[in-house]
Amino acid sequence: RMLNQNEADLVYTLDSHIYDTNYINLQEGRIGVHFVCAANHPLADRPSVSLKELIQQPFLLTEKGMSYRRVMDEALAAKSLEIRPVFVSGNTDLIRNLVAQGAGISFLPDYTTKELIAAGKLKYLQVPEMKVEIWTQLLHHRDKWISEPMRIVIDYLHKCIL
């Protein structure tokens, strides 16, 4: 919407894939996202966990409507399921650290958890019933002229985060 109304020159998303012929997709990439728990959690070493069993666990989640949380909620709703979290925060670092301490389970992008996974403090839960795709995309409106400052920002984003 912001691109269509010329309220933004560029948009960098972390969400479900956006398909729109009005937008030029400058860069995109699929982002891994998993349910995670503490390494010593009873579900941690299971080869797979059912959704019905999983949603009975205490959950620490990002705020409702936030990109990957919204995508997860929609996927669960399609199965007539929902998670009622015991803790909600916009602070992903806080959530992942609480999960690592055994406070519950969360659903987070891999780039936020890979450090604690590598350190053996968190584990990914395998939930075969839940296939969710999260994408990063750098978009601009098809009719938008790319100014020199925009080109500099685009080049910076390509070097640093894309």
Residue ranges of model-derived segments:
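Hydrophobic residues within well-ordered alpha-helices
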Residues: M2-N4, L54, N97-A103, L138
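A late-sequence structural motif
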Residues: K123-L162
